Amino acid sequence: YHKYSVKDYYAVDEQYGTMQDFEELAAECEKREIKLLIDLVMNHSSNEHEWFKHASKSLRSDPCGAAKDKPCLNDNICPVHDKYIDYYYFTDEKPVGTNSWYRIGSNRWYQAVFSEQMPELNLDNSAVRSEFEKIADFWLEKGAGGFRLDAVKEYFSGNPEKNIEVLNQFMKHCKTVDPKCYVVGEVWESFTSYTKYFSSGIDSVFGC
């Protein structure tokens, strides 16, 4: 209902309108010197996103038989070769002392802190970061003036230094594409805690 379980980062949810509606809105905002920000969720996706569905299918499949450094024999539907498995956090055993892991298939678990429908993305993976740079490029080209980044402090919960490093890379990319791009991050912490995030180069942050 809240649309933070993203199924497609390159589409407008039909409840909000069409891509044409977005483009027209962006054009009208530009005429009025209003920045139109995209609410961008990098912490997690929907479990119905193609990345997660592809990884899930591979984890339920048998290995194709080829070595990891050789081409897959099953069109990358394979627990050895599927790159999307590393887009998320999967494990063979449920970690003890946490309720944020959910079963997939008979012997695998995935992490989803906010809900079972929103698996955590692995922002340690450079390929995942590159995906979001491409997503940013797409929306900036469509006329967005920047981004509101959701749940920034949860990228690596309890590790603000790593969160800041992710933000810094994202900011450098966005400012290279559009120096006037404006980015604000949701950091749900006290003022004294979230001010450290300005060291990432982000334009603004907000919290409680």
How would you name each of these model-derived features?
Residues 135-136, 142:
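Pore-domain-biased detector for 6-TM cation channels and related repeats
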